[in-house]
């Protein structure tokens, strides 16, 4: 099997699962928290799909660098932990010094969080979110290209 075919199949399966997960999460928010979804479902799906592909690329790149299968989890945590801390997952990145805000906004998880929040909670159109989408496209594209180059079957 060619590496490209394998990686595309992996990305496609992740996209299908992600669509189901996002739909269930939105439904849960609407039913139990009376959340109003102000953005279009198409925009939300596109942002979530792009986020899924972005982090699929980051994950594959990280895993491709591991020498042993046992070290993949540790490497993923090493990459993701700073993003969880800085990207506004647990608390607003606005609490960090203004000096590092540009770096935080260049992280793919920050772009994904901000884009989803803006679309779902504020109804921000997709075209107004192009800087966030560009961050995710760059991270995902570069990660996938490097993962294809460095991916090992052994």
Predicted regions and their residues:
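Hydrophobic alpha-helical interface/terminus motif in multipass membrane transporters
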Residues: 28-32, 62, 66, 86, ...
């Amino acid at each position: 099997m060619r590496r490209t075919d394998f990686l595309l199949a992996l990305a496609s399966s992740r996209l299908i699962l992600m669509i189901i997960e996002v739909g269930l999460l939105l439904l849960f928010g609407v039913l139990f928290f009376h959340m109003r979804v102000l953005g279009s479902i198409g925009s939300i799906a596109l942002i979530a799909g792009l986020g899924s592909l972005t982090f699929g690329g980051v994950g594959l790149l990280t895993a491709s660098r591991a020498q042993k299968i046992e070290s993949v989890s540790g490497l993923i945590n090493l990459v993701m932990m700073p993003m969880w801390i800085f990207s506004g997952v647990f608390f607003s990145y606005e609490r960090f010094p203004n000096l590092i805000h540009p770096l935080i906004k260049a992280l793919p998880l920050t772009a994904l969080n901000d884009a989803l929040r803006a679309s779902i909670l504020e109804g921000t159109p997709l075209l107004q979110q192009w800087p966030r989408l560009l961050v995710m496209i760059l991270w995902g594209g570069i990660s996938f290209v490097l993962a294809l180059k460095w991916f090992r079957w052994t």
